[in-house]
Amino acid sequence: MNIVDTRARNTFNFVKRKNIKNIPLFELSFLDHSIDISGYTDVIFQSTPSVEFFNHHKDLIDKNVFAMGPGTQSSLGTKGISSKIPEDPGSEGLKKLIKSSIGSGKFLIVKGQGGLNIISDYLEAEGAEVDTVQNYQRVRFSSYFDISKDFDNADFVIFPSRLAAEIYFQEIYNPDINSKFVTISSRIKDYV
């Protein structure tokens, strides 16, 4: 069985995946995000790359740290940072989890450029103090010609992000190849 994961190369490095070929469809690059986090009580990481590109891990010791799901929590754990995750991974589950922290908390959301605003919009609507920092960007490749043949024998293609799915269907998809698709969220599934 041939399984292709389209996750960016520098994410989930801590997970050993046997029998899964990683073929990234975009790169991640660092964005400068110098920020004093001393005034924040709660820090939310929206993705594994937001953890990996964050410059202030040592300053999280006295903060309430939240992760969007188990992958992001694992990434924080490899850096020695304890975090809470929702019972149901994703924005809706996280809203329920952070509801009790809203009153007196000041939130910092760490995410990639162009990342979802669902949590920040929710916190603002609830009257919370919230700031967002974008510490990485997703960069499309200039061409997909050379990697498209790597998908010809894929039984399954995994999409960890909507961008990966968009790129795949715009640049690589061949209706003559009978691959099945796996998504990590209902939002990506709805797109696929």
Which residues does each predicted region cover?
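Signature of uroporphyrinogen-III synthase
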Residues: M1-V192
